[in-house]
Amino acid sequence: MKEYLDLLNLILKNGYPKIDRTKTGTLSMFGYQIRINLNEGFPLLTTKYCHFKSIVYELLWFLRGDTNISFLKKNNISIWNKWADKNGNLGPIYGKQWRAWEDKKNNTIDQIEIALNKLKKEPSSRRILVSSWNVGELDLMSIPPCHVLFQLYVINNKLSCQVYQRSCDIFLGLPFNIGSYALLTHIFANQCDLLVEDLIWTGGDIHLYKNHLNQAKLQLTRSPLPLPKIFIKKKPKNLFNYAFNDFLLIDYNHHPKIKAPISI
């Protein structure tokens, strides 16, 4: 994806040195937008290997409303291990907020179900939003949400999604986040018999950790390859019944993996 490489190059050249919570140090910039036409292929980075299995299982985990890593560990996904407590709990992170946001009357609100119903019954609505940024529960989370909000938009029977990410690790996180929200858009479209259109990613504090500089420079020496395609094999009776094997990634050709440490 040239759009991603352009942002990576921009932050290498113009990013401001900034001390961060992890004490690793970053090059940082504020505010940027990428628009990806999902009809041109599934936006999984080709200039390094991205683990599609982790993207799928994490998204299915979110959609289950789960906040314990046991489901991920059962499927050999370790991406959340370092943030979990000794019992595997992460507090009321994404899954809890998406599926069971608590109101002041102690009722729970299923934002995903509401969004799905609006897409089916009122696709022109400007209120098809899902938020993870529950101010009243931030201090109970192992880490506050990085991608905090997404909005769905339908025109001419085509579905677009815009996501706002307050904090973005551009080297390790962003390729994963783009893949995840692209897949989520395809899932909503599949459930609602819509076509897909655009994924719009909007970033707040976008940062390249200083222990990722050499990896970023290596990646910029590589030329993007044609994007893969995504095929959803069936339409389950509801959005929460998808399984990993329902998704087929076709023709994912990529450059070799580039290892980089995670800052916690």
Curated annotation (Swiss-Prot):
Protein name: Thymidylate synthase
GO aspect biological process, one term: methylation
PANTHER family, alphabetized: THYMIDYLATE SYNTHASE (PTHR11548:SF9), THYMIDYLATE SYNTHASE 1 (PTHR11548)
Family classification: Belongs to the thymidylate synthase family. Bacterial-type ThyA subfamily.
Intracellular or extracellular location(s): Cytoplasm
Function comment: Catalyzes the reductive methylation of 2'-deoxyuridine-5'-monophosphate (dUMP) to 2'-deoxythymidine-5'-monophosphate (dTMP) while utilizing 5,10-methylenetetrahydrofolate (mTHF) as the methyl donor and reductant in the reaction, yielding dihydrofolate (DHF) as a by-product. This enzymatic reaction provides an intracellular de novo source of dTMP, an essential precursor for DNA biosynthesis.
GO cellular component, one term: cytosol
Pathway(s): Pyrimidine metabolism; dTTP biosynthesis
InterPro entries: Thymidate_synth/dCMP_Mease, Thymidate_synth/dCMP_Mease_dom, Thymidate_synth/dCMP_Mease_sf, Thymidylate_synthase, Thymidylate_synthase_AS
Gene3D superfamilies to which the protein is assigned, alphabetical: Thymidylate synthase/dCMP hydroxymethylase domain (3.30.572.10)
GO MF assignments: thymidylate synthase activity
Ligand binding ((6R)-5,10-methylene-5,6,7,8-tetrahydrofolate): H51, D169, S263
Binding site for dUMP: R21, R126, R127, R166, S167, C168, D169, N177, H207, L208, Y209
UniProt KW keywords: Cytoplasm, Methyltransferase, Nucleotide biosynthesis, Transferase
Active site: C146
CDD domains xrefs: TS_Pyrimidine_HMase
Pfam families assigned: Thymidylat_synt
Catalytic activity: dUMP + (6R)-5,10-methylene-5,6,7,8-tetrahydrofolate = 7,8-dihydrofolate + dTMP
Self-association and partners: Homodimer.
Enzyme Commission number, as recorded: 2.1.1.45
